[in-house]
Amino acid sequence: MTNSNGEPAFKPGPRVWIYRGFLAAVILGTAALGWYASRLAGSTLAATALPSSSPLATSRPSSTAAPLTQPALVSETAEPREPIVGQEGTLVFSARRDGRTHLWAYIIGDPSPRQITFGEWDDRDPAIDPLGERIAFASNRRGYWDLYLLDLGSGEVRALTETPGYEGHPTWSPDGRWIAYEAYESGDFDIWILPVSLDQEPIRLTNHPANDLSPAWDPNGRRIAFVSERDGGRDIFLADLDRPDDRFQNLTHTAELEEGDPAFSPDGSRLAYVQYGFGFPQITTAPLDGEIQSTVRGQGRKPAWSPQGEVLAAILDSPHDSQIVSYVADGAHARRIGFPVILDLGHIDWTPFDLRQPVMQLAASEQAAVPLYEVATDAPAGPGGRITLKALPGVEAPNPMLSDAVDEAFLALRERALRELGWDFLSTLDFAFAGINDPLPPGLTYRDWLYTGRAFAFSLSAVQAGWIEVVREDFGGQTYWRVYVRAAEQDGSLGEPLRDHPWDFEARFEGDSQAYDQGGLEKTRIPLGYYVDFTRLAADYGFERLPALPNWRTYYHGARFHEFVHRDGLDWESAMLELYPPSALITPTPFQTPTPTPTRTLRPTPTPWWWRWLTPTATSTPTPQPSITPSPAP
């Protein structure tokens, strides 16, 4: 467009040219970033699956008549995959199935792991000797937690310790003649050393009032790493066996973080451990030659080095299960190689030896699993085929009933808890079934699982009596709780010592503003004695813990640590429809909505003009005068 002189009607000013140049730079920069991102994505290591994606046989009961029938351990359709660099040998770990924790072995390249110990007890904390011939582990097969030795050639198991109390977490010396382990005695953990030949008395390595636990023996033989709270926080310490004086050295010195699970690299030059304090555990590695310079490798706990030191295997937890993953030990990129495992996956050890033959022999002794309980449901009642409620005999609760789909699971859990704890923990409940119109404590929601008949809440009076401890666990921005119940017998024959600091809800009422805002604080000291992990026990029978509600820091009941639900894969609405017709789930209106009535708005009325001219006339008011009061006559 031009003017009458043939010149452009609009000439761009300097600001317009600057704006156009800036816009062109933004467009070119965006294109360059897109090209660079595509090149970067093409060069990033892709996540690699473990040679098997076959799940370990689950311990969760289903709603069938035989809820825990054991599936085949080896999938018929699974095919071995080529192992990635640094993967060879055999992984040995503990995992929970059919209500018990036992040892499992996974040969790299096989489609699935195999169970190698069996029985109505728990086996865990496996450690393979340097020659791949024996496995040291902890077990409560005789009631108390002791150390045992499994001969892989003969399958023979012999006891290394037979003491009242607790021993666990063994680790081998490089020559295979000694085992270091943790023992709970006089109210705290200490590190001991035991000759495998049992020709000498155990040697006490640490003797400190604070907890010393989780030992790991240096492959070079002269150092033992362990976790200690002697400096206030939980740090990684190093014990030099050649220095009787000034033997212990704090390697981490992190007041704001806690560390655990130390593991030496095969050549002893690096140490892997776990850092806590970010809302999730982080696998960290650090060289031991000079000042500690740690590098985060990924999320997880219980790290184990591959035989060549190129890969770190670890356990990655979710609220209800675990899986084995691994990370490249040298490099910024992680390779996840996990297969899913149900619940409570424990300590991992990695040996360079192919233990296929002894593992197959041990796995051949496996027997058919006995179901933890049998489900017997009545025929659905009513026109909608809804499930009925069943009374819970001997249980005290406002409504001692549960859905017919889960009542057998609860009764079996109650009986198991009685055996494990030595007292009837589930005989009294705060809630079992809650009617659709029954009020719940402040902080709980209308869509609570207690309304479904599939959930229960144990009595909080046990918490007030000091028989319950809860440990906070965060997953993906949600807060969960692990519940520990104190055993009736405190001689070590029931339960085990606590290893983590429980949460103190009462701290928010003690005048600390930070504790009030956070809904409490961790207890400074771990309570003494022996406890049973009730969260794990409930999961054996299909009862899951629930996440805390967003209001839990304000409302105590919103923490929901005492509520457990048997979902059977159902969401809340589907579970409610097992008991109620759809019309009953419409949110009720608590009162009739008022209908607004229109009201006339009064308008000001003008004052007549003649009233505006009237001036008020003052009215005289007589002023009272004082009078003289005559004096009385004498």
Regions flagged by a language model, labelled:
Residues D438-S459:
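Short, surface-exposed glycine/acidic/tryptophan-bearing loops
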Residues Q464-P594:
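Catalytic cores and adjacent binding grooves of peptidoglycan-active enzymes
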Residues G422-L444, N551-G558:
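Acidic helix-start/capping segments at beta-turn-to-alpha-helix junctions
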Residues V85, R447-G453, Y555-H557:
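Extracellular/periplasmic catalytic domains that process cell-envelope and extracellular macromolecules
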Residues T2-E7, P12-A376, I628-P632:
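Sequence signature of WD/YWTD-type beta-propeller architectures
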Residues F425-T428, A455-L460, R545-A548, H562-E563:
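Structural recognition of the beta-strand scaffold that forms the well-ordered cores
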